[in-house]
Amino acid sequence: MCLESDGVGTVSNSQGCIPGAEERGLETLPGRMNPTSLDVKAVELESSSSKPDKAYNWKRASVAAAGILSVGNVLNYLDRYTVAGVLLDIQQHFEVKDSGAGLLQTVFICSFMVAAPIFGYLGDRFNRKVILSSGIFFWSAITFSSSFIPKKYFWLLVLSRGLVGIGEASYSTIAPTIIGDLFTKNTRTLMLSVFYFAIPLGSGLGYITGSSVKQVAGDWRWALRVSPVLGVITGTLLLIFVPTAKRGHAEQLKGSSWIRDMRGLIKNRSYVFSSLATSTVSFATGALGMWIPLYLYRAQVVQKSVEPCNIPPCSTKDSLIFGAITCLTGFLGVIIGAGATKWCRRKTQRADPLVCAVGMLGSAIFICLVFVAAKSSIIAAYICIFAGETLLFSNWAITADMLMYVVIPTRRATAVALQSFTSHLLGDAGSPYLIGFISDLIQQSTTKSSLWEFLSLGYALMLCPFVVVLGGMFFLATALFFLEDREKAEKLEPCSDPFTVGNCSDSEEASIL
């Protein structure tokens, strides 16, 4: 060939050469090209054709990761509420009163909320899936060990629940932020709905697993040996299959100090009010989840439909029914909450906090009716529990999604940790013990009888619906500032798909599924 390149991709004839067919074959509309530039074009074309494959593989990996993270969340709550499923047996075995039994959950939550901000700080700065798996392995080992504690060492069981709380804090704090970075917009809402459905599902399975395993094995200790085995398996899968997701647009955002992050979150009014609302949800779910099965058992003793249990193993019927109701209402609540929010977004941009507020206020009505119905009809009480829990659970995924909307990516783990801390501090850290303490206080002022054991616990639990109404007010306050805070965060909100350039469209998100 008789061609020369000038070094920038244009080709000219050498002196004395006559253009031939080969040269004419390389002509293009804008001019001529040399073989080198053709190779570059071919490489670029090959790269662009492989880009959709990489994007598809990334999306599949993201969906799989969200599934594994959701399974891990199920196990966290299964382990947490296994104790509640065998609470009556624990009371009989260690010979503790209502306040002592409530202390198990209170110590767990206290250690959980203290550890949450620490893991939030670590989650914004270090490898998140390593922290998650380490936390799972830790609480699995502690839970398994606690099943061998002798009768005279109740304080060791209390201490072990505190250590389990530290391990589970790592998961609940960091896992939602990984999902928040893997998905955007409606897809993120869907994936967070699946993740937070794990809360009622795991809670219900905790009651069912605890009571069923105890019934089969004839010993409540075996109930504490199921979740650790599953935890080790899940922790291993998490290490292998969950990708190391980028923290939103963290590589292009300037890092900030922890103090600056905290100041930014405290000034975020939507975040503050939604965190206070979440605290009321935690208060109610912590108290009701701990005491409702025992309350309904005492109601049946008063109605003389069951005999009092003085020596374990005791009846597991109420724990099984309550666990099944919790699983079903959690599923319905998450679906109803996500569906109602999606529909209401067509009407108003403040749909998220408004749907939560309506759910809370409606839930308070049915929770009140539980204590009225339980005096005469257990079936009616279960119906009210079903309706109240469905409405109460409808806001979990929505609240998490609101946080992702109003908080910038580099602060999300810290935001989740701080929200977890405040919700537990003001919520279920004290509510199980507080309800037990009030119940004991009322019993001390009356004659000891099955009737007053039932009534005292019911009077104490009546605190819950009033707290739930307060939560509805906080969600209404969130609606006032939601749009302004979301707009501020969206200025720094990136597309979480590393293979997409520019903004993510809803059609692109839909292709993930």
From Swiss-Prot:
The keyword Nucleotide-binding does not apply. The keyword Transport applies. SUPFAM superfamilies: MFS general substrate transporter. It holds the Pfam family MFS_1. One of its GO terms (molecular function) is sphingolipid transporter activity. It is a multi-pass membrane protein. The chain crosses the membrane at residues 102-122, 130-150, 163-183, 190-210, 222-242, 276-296, 320-340, 354-374, 378-398, 422-442, 463-483. PANTHER family: SPHINGOSINE-1-PHOSPHATE TRANSPORTER SPNS2, SPINSTER. Belongs to the major facilitator superfamily. Spinster (TC 2.A.1.49) family. Lipid transporter that specifically mediates export of sphingosine-1-phosphate (sphing-4-enine 1-phosphate, S1P) and sphinganine-1-phosphate. This is Sphingosine-1-phosphate transporter SPNS2. It comes from Xenopus tropicalis (Western clawed frog). The gene is spns2.
